[in-house]
Amino acid sequence: MRTVLALMNRNRKLFFKDKGMLFTSMITPVILIVLYATFLAKVFRDSFTAAIPDMITISDELINGTVAAQLTASLMAVSCITVTFCVNLTMVQDKANGTRKDFNVSPVSRGKIYLGYFLSTVANSLMVNGLAFVLCLGYLFKMGWYMNTADVLWVLFDMILLVLFGSTLSSIISFPLTTQGQLSAVGTIVSAGYGFICGAYMPISNFGSGLQKVLSYLPSTYATSLIKNHMLHGVFREMERKHYPGEMVEAIRDTLDCNPVFHGNVVSVNQMIGIMIGSIAVFGIIYYLVILLSKGEGRR
């Protein structure tokens, strides 16, 4: 275990030593929240107000708080996954600059080497996304704050789950890559496409029924819905306190993807947590098997 921790710390130091990569990773959440607030806030606001009956009046503060909570939840859902591909660059860099050849002739097992990469990816991703979460809380405080301490802690738990999910996924995808250009290309594809697939840029409820059924099989759908449920929990609590019709509140929950459906059944929050834990376990096993089955790497 001491060897694994030493490798993890070595990878983390390399991440902090690369000022360009560190700056890019740290500035990404700031850029995302500005872009989301600029281009997606109106889309989210229109989607929310469309579910409100004409005879119901909702204060601008509650509307702004709802839109801000949906926006920040979407940002965190994307950031927790895409950032892992950026901070996982060390694994590819070691192959590109020949450092892995030194590791391969050392007495350290391949499993420990790759576990060190994985743990450093998790640690660095949590740091970057922790900054993103602080920025999101500041934005929520400005636009409309309805969260309590329990809601904040649940979102932190969601963030850890999503970072673990993203780290296992990025480790599997990055494993066969040998150049920084390849990882940059993969990172670009993931950054551009993941937000649409997970329902962050546009609620999945706005998609066609066929596409909704396809996306219901992807864990990313439930990852986004999970963090939305906890980010928006205070908003729905405020709506219930003001005695808004239950049908309207449920319609809003459906519109914002807080009630994902799988084969006609609504997936509960506890089930979403189970899906994420199961997905992390499955991808972790796949990553372990990929390491075991890689042929000849240690002899090259």
Question: What role is predicted for each listed range?
Answer:
Residues 1-32, 97-98, 112, 295-297:
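Aromatic- and glycine-rich beta-strand/loop motifs that create alpha-glucan
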Residues 110, 118-198:
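Alpha-helical transmembrane segments and their short interhelical loops
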Residues 14-50, 67-85, 126-129, 189-195, ...:
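Hydrophobic alpha-helical transmembrane segments of multi-pass membrane transport/permease proteins
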Residues 242-300:
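Junction motif at the cytosolic side of a transmembrane helix
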Residues 47-63:
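Perimembrane loop-to-helix junctions flanking transmembrane segments
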Residues 34-44, 174-235:
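Transmembrane helix segments
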Residues 7, 25-26, 75, 94, ...:
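Residue-level recognition of transmembrane alpha-helices
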Residues 31, 63-142:
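Hydrophobic alpha-helical transmembrane segments of multi-pass membrane transport proteins
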